[in-house]
Amino acid sequence: MQKFTVHQGLVAPMDRENVDTDAIIPKQFLKSIRKTGFGPNLFDEWRYLDAGFPGQDPASRKPNPDFVLNQARYKGASILLARKNFGCGSSREHAPWALDQFGFRAIIAPSYADIFFNNSFKNGLLPIVLPEAQVAQLFDEALAFPGYTLTIDLERQVIVKAQGEELPFDVQAFRKYCLLNGFDDIGLTLLQSDKIKAFEAQRLAGKPWLSHTVAG
């Protein structure tokens, strides 16, 4: 998992409440057994005017010119600004995968659905919670100023505006540790590899028959 320490990025404002996971990545794209390839279909039914299907070349699609992520001023955005209850709906982990693979490193919103919130941390995506009034102010600024960027300093737990104003945010200590070090669940398990090897050796010594294979 990619480490998250300090990130400066262009902000894309998605001015919708209750954005659900089916909007983030529609169900027809969940058939893949791989964890990659979801970025091109992020917000698929909003980004395109035609219906999409798995394996389709995005270049052949008809983009919706009114959708925020299709507007030139937000091309390359890596910070998504959202309204309350972002990520509601079903518990599909594909939602943070799609956001990450599209290029987003962080989301800023007043609130999130619990499962989406937890899944985001586990996949290297930082979901920041700010008071609704502060989020509204960020929307005003992002819409008013083309090229609007923010710097997110996870170590200090602050969002820094271009003029230097800082907005503090909370993050649970263990989640912060994992993001700063790039540890997903597998990475955390591998930190205990010496203990795992010692346990396996001890188990083999006490129960050697467990290592035997059955002839076919």
Swiss-Prot record:
The enzyme's E.C. designation: 4.2.1.33
Major enzyme class: lyase
Reaction(s) this enzyme catalyzes, per UniProt: (2R,3S)-3-isopropylmalate = (2S)-2-isopropylmalate
BP-aspect Gene Ontology terms: L-leucine biosynthetic process
GO CC annotations on file: 3-isopropylmalate dehydratase complex
Keywords per UniProt: Amino-acid biosynthesis, Branched-chain amino acid biosynthesis, Leucine biosynthesis, Lyase
Pfam families in the record: Aconitase_C (PF00694)
SUPFAM superfamilies tied to this protein: LeuD/IlvD-like
Pathway(s) annotated for this protein in UniProt: Amino-acid biosynthesis; L-leucine biosynthesis; L-leucine from 3-methyl-2-oxobutanoate: step 2/4
Subunit structure: Heterodimer of LeuC and LeuD.
UniProt-recorded name of the protein: 3-isopropylmalate dehydratase small subunit
Organism: Polaromonas naphthalenivorans (strain CJ2)
Classification of source organism: Bacteria, Pseudomonadati, Pseudomonadota, Betaproteobacteria, Burkholderiales
